[in-house]
């Protein structure tokens, strides 16, 4: 069993050595453990720090590409080098690397395809009450779109089996976290959760500038992933809703026509026609998308 622990980094020179030092080198059931650092256009000594700590596998971006691209490039590299399982953590040392064996256990036992660490966000001291609620809301949206019951969908500390990674297709440029869950849930993969306690905060998030930007980008990623697998739900609703709305003006026109008052109600026909055309277009898109 060959496991790759991949660490996406952007200017993590100060904290990367702590992350590398805390990664267990001997894990029951694992024959080979490799460490991969993805340098996402760092301008500090991140790569130098990785090499000084003996990291043999490094993927470098000449400019910052974002977390999703770093994750995808790391996965491609790990799979090309024979990884059976890929563990993703972070270069800021927010996650307890000593819990990596607990993430691997359900996969090694054949019980899960993906294992996600539950940070228990309600108990994280530096999270504001608003942020905790938004984390809970985001996880709820992901669970609704994926058909899962995960307590912490935004956690980046997770393990993927080779089989699961070969079936996932990350298309967003923001964050892979929620998108891969929506895809995995709709592909009926087995996903488990493991409770952890995060390490003390070392820096502000570089993934987004404020919580509202994070909400917008996360929401967009969730909707896009949902549409990839269940386009019939929103498009079907749109087709039915606009079709019904479109029929109402026609019925109204017919009522006036039978009463001999059809003049002056052409606007109803125009509006109704527009709605029915929209309904037909939605139905056509549904067929194509499905």
Regions found by a protein language model. Name each.
Residues 7-21, 41:
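Active-site beta-to-alpha loop of glycosyltransferases that engages the nucleotide-sugar donor
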Residues 171-290:
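Hydrophobic helical membrane-anchoring modules
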Residues 2-4, 34, 179:
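Cell-envelope/extracellular polymer assembly enzymes that use nucleotide-activated donors
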Residues 21-32:
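Short, acidic, metal-binding catalytic loop of nucleotide-sugar glycosyltransferases
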Residues 31-41:
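Short beta-strand/loop segment that forms part of the nucleotide-sugar
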Residues 57, 61-80, 85-87, 97-174, ...:
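Acceptor/aglycone-binding surface of glycosyltransferases and processive sugar-polymer synthases
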Residues 4-8, 36-37, 60:
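Short hydrophobic beta-strand elements that form part
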Residues 39-47, 93:
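A conserved acidic beta->alpha catalytic loop
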């Amino acid at each position: 069993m060959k496991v790759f622990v991949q660490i996406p980094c952007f200017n993590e020179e100060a904290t990367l050595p702590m992350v590398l030092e805390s990664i267990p080198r001997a894990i029951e059931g694992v024959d080979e453990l490799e460490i991969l650092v993805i340098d996402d256009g760092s301008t500090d000594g991140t790569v130098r720090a990785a090499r000084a700590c003996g990291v043999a596998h490094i993927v470098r971006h000449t400019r910052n590409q974002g977390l999703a691209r770093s994750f995808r490039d790391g996965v491609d590299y790990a799979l090309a080098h024979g990884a059976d399982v890929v563990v993703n953590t972070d270069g800021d040392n927010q996650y307890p690397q000593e819990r990596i064996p607990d993430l691997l256990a359900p996969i090694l036992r054949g019980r899960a395809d993906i294992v996600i660490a539950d940070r228990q966000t309600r108990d994280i001291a530096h999270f504001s009450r608003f942020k905790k609620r938004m984390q809970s809301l985001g996880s709820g949206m992901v669970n609704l779109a994926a058909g899962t019951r995960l307590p912490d969908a935004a956690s980046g500390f997770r393990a993927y089996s080779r089989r699961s990674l070969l079936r996932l297709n990350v298309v967003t440029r923001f964050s892979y976290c929620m998108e891969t869950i929506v895809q995995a849930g709709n592909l009926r993969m087995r996903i488990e959760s493991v409770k952890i306690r995060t390490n003390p905060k070392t820096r502000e998030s570089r993934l987004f500038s404020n919580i509202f930007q994070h909400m917008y980008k996360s929401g967009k990623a969730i909707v896009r992933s949902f549409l990839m697998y269940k386009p019939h739900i929103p498009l079907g609703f749109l087709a039915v809703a606009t079709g019904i709305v479109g029929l109402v003006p026609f019925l109204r026109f017919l009522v006036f026509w039978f009463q001999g008052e059809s003049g002056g109600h052409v606007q109803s026909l125009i509006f109704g026609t527009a709605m029915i055309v929209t309904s037909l277009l939605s139905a056509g898109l549904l067929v194509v998308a499905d």
